[in-house]
Amino acid sequence: MQQPARNWSSPTTHRLKDLKSAFACALHMHQPTVPAGPDGALISHLQYMLEHPNEGDNHNAEPFAHCYRRMAELIPELIREGCSPRIMLDYSGNLLWGVVQMGREDITGALHHLACD
């Protein structure tokens, strides 16, 4: 079976002893599951936020959704600019379940691109 071409950079050639500076970042992305759907069905809190924009800070639902897919824009951009970004991304199962349930292919597609291409 032929292996697909990779779009990402190869493993780093940087040697730890030669680095003068570095930056570490880890992002934890999460949205809880809440019993707020029809008849108390479980839904993503992000979905609840989108459906109730006038409660609390729920008006921020779409910016949150943008953050969940943003890494798939930033990382390829940094690679194109000649950088070798390294980042740990931690997306909770609840968040992934919720965005799939909501049909947010903009998010799942971006994450699939980031993880698999």
Mark where each language-model region is:
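N-terminal regions that are enriched for targeting/export leaders
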Residues: M1-L89, N94, G98-D117
